[in-house]
Amino acid sequence: GTAMVKAFDLECGRTGILDHERAREAGFDPVSETITAGSRSGYYPGAAETTVTLTADRDTGRLLGGSIVGTDRAAIRIDTIATALGGEMTVAELERQDLGYAPPFSPVWDPVLVAAKVVNGSLP
């Protein structure tokens, strides 16, 4: 399932399989990467760091799960990952998504897309 929580200013979201042991039990060879990127264009007021972890299957590149932590509307980004999971996307397919850009709302490269690119680059 997909979940979001907020404690004071900190927002967290998670979806899918993140635990490597559980992924192996399900027949996957998991690989995870964690990145930290800006929530909006860096020059825009209110920009903050967002940390994204994605887990994928090493053999197929299929996205298995993800988590997000940050203070600037971070948790809602978990819906992008949940949608990709529902579509059984690979991290390469997620990386190519054309997410909206406007400085008040997001950086040119959304943190989820940056994470997908990093995971995709670590696959054989």
Predicted regions located by residue number:
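N-terminal periplasmic "start-of-domain" segments of outer-membrane beta-barrel proteins
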Residues: 1-7
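Short glycine-/small-residue-rich flexible loop motifs, especially phosphate/cofactor-binding loops
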Residues: 2, 19-21
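Flexible, glycine-rich terminal cap/loop adjacent to redox cofactors
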Residues: 7-15, 24-124
